Amino acid sequence: RRPDMTAARPALFLDRDGVINVDRNYIYRVEDFAWIEGAQDVIRRFNDMGWWVFVVTNQSGIARGLYTEEQMQALHDWMGEELAKSGARIDRIYHCPFHEDGTIARYTKDSFDRKPKPGMLIRAMTDFPVIKERSFMIGDKQADIEAASAAGVRGFLFSGGNLASFTDWVLADMGEGR
């Protein structure tokens, strides 16, 4: 069931590669995708807690001509279908296809959306009623943490392992324990 789209609630911001799925460089095909242990459970748990769940992901492979936005979208659609099987959902996936060193002209530029800049998080907080003070970001790179900080939310660096165990620790650290 979808939450009330007008009610303000905290948000969980997740990086994709290295947090939701194993980072194997430029993932855009289902057959190359492997869930991080605990990732689906975390998304479902935060859905059940009434939080927004957003993915904010740099996808420079698009600018570099390695895959298309349509191929990336097909993977994101598949992720949504897989999550739905376990009663979980991502409220929106924000992606940045731009990179200054791209090879595809229309994507070769600097962008406020490209982490460590905060554009994708700010867009999510503009598109949805988010309680910023209780929201946080989990990423596997310093750029994720810097983007969170620039957007005014806390950031936590995930270095691998079980994402559910990690978010238990984060919630306790934030005083949001279950």
PLM ranges: what are they?
Residues 2, 7, 70-92, 100-137, ...:
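Asp-based, Mg2+/Mn2+-dependent phosphohydrolase catalytic module
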Residues 2-54:
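Active-site neighborhood of HAD-like aspartate-dependent phosphohydrolases
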Residues 14-16, 57, 138-140:
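Active-site flanking residues adjacent to catalytic metal/cofactor-binding acidic residues
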Residues 20-37, 62-71, 85-88, 98, ...:
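Metal-dependent phosphoesterase signature
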Residues 52-58, 91-96:
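Short beta-strand segments at enzyme active-site cores
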